[in-house]
Amino acid sequence: MEEKKGLGLGRLVSIATGTVIGAGIVSLLGVAMLFTGASGWLAYSAAVIVGLIVISPYIILCSTMRINGGNYSYVSAVLGDFWGGIYGLCFTMVGLAMGLFGMSLGTYVKLIFPSIDVRIFAMCIVTFFFVLNLFGVNLMAKVENVLFYLLMIGLLSYVVMGFAKMTPETITVGQPDFFAGGAKGFLSAVVLLMFSTTGQSYVVAFSREARNPKRDIPLAILITTGVILVLYTLVGFVTCNILPASEVAGQNLAVVAREIMPGWMYYLFLIGGPIAAIFTTMNSSFVIFSRPLETMVKDGFFPATLGKTNKWGVPYFLITFIYIIGMLPLIFNFSMGAIVDDSILIESIAEVLAIVAVLRFPEKIEGAWENRYFKFSKGFFRFVVILALLTRIALIINTCTTLTPAIIVVTVVSVLIFALYNYFRIKGNHVHVNKSYELQ
């Protein structure tokens, strides 16, 4: 059976797709329309393309080796234990976004059950997926596979019903509210929407369980990118061309769904579309965010006790730590905007380190370049990685211009704390980075 041999391409695609299609498509499109009006769908297409540029180094890297500890494995191998530790801690803190996923899910469930408390429900659903992930990757992958098909049916029904309802009069291309915020507004929308266009690269965390990681991980990322380019563009086009942009901006997909679907189908869409989308992302997030920590424990950044596993091979202390991180925004009632802003900035800092490591790995990891599955040239490799690095830096600069000083200060202080922790842990001779990748 497949679980004995490892995860095949099909399951990796469903995991990657389920991870990337989540709170973003169902919650952020309306926010993006506040910046750019009815051109929100075009901003989504651009965000997917820019996102592919940013994650392209990982596609190349994954074709050369099995990465057992997520991106942390090669960052520490190439840049050293200090920078590897900073990457791992920064990446793990993106787990704060699970609070966003829970709140987004709660807003949709409230449309079906108006009496629920959104924040309490969000806490319950994060807890549910925490417990589910304690039973191992195989169960998680099976659940993800089912949710994937439910998600596709839900979003495609939204697209089909939307195009059936659309008329030439409702199409806004060329109208005053198209590019409503000008070039700056459009760019701000692209940067915001990128929060939901790069998550397919997180499938790297499942390299250890993949049957043929050097081929299937890159293909899963590319296939998923193609899927979301088409799906996000279509969903966005429907969302921006049924009702006036002023009625949809700042709202979620339910506003348009209620307009284009009969009552019974509207409720089925809520379950198969937005709710399934957020379910798939939350389901895979525990493994994705805990995988670097698992390897960091083995390398000595944290006490060995934290790496203990249960009978399903799950590091339950680390999964619990990720659970606590995800619950913090819910317990302290952080705003969704603050969660997104902080997550984007912390992730961007971590990804700069990861891209620099990719650029240097052919010289630092002996035999890796010769071992690549896809035989691209070094010139092409350098062009792609440098373009990704420059794009990521430009995005950080643009993001900082739109963030509040408080978010920037909190992020910088967090990174400094991570750096100090790593410094004293290494100085105390606790850290001994082990090889956590395999050349096959």
Mark where each language-model region is.
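TM-loop-TM module centered on a large, flexible mid-protein loop between adjacent transmembrane helices
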Residues: 73-75, 80, 111-113, 222-283, ...
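Helix-loop-helix junctions that connect adjacent transmembrane segments
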Residues: 2-3, 117, 145-267
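A generic transmembrane alpha-helix motif of multi-pass inner-membrane proteins
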Residues: 345-347, 377-440
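Membrane-interface loop-to-helix entry segments
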Residues: 118-168, 180-181, 198, 221-226, ...
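Helix-loop-helix connectors at the membrane interface of multi-pass transporters/channels
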Residues: 2, 74-78, 102-122, 154, ...
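Transmembrane alpha-helical segments of multi-pass small-molecule transport proteins
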Residues: 11-13, 45-46, 87, 112-139, ...
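Hydrophobic transmembrane alpha-helices that form the core helical bundles
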Residues: 31-35, 43, 53-134, 139, ...
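Membrane-interface "cap" regions at the ends of multi-pass membrane proteins
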Residues: 1-39, 51-56, 68, 173, ...
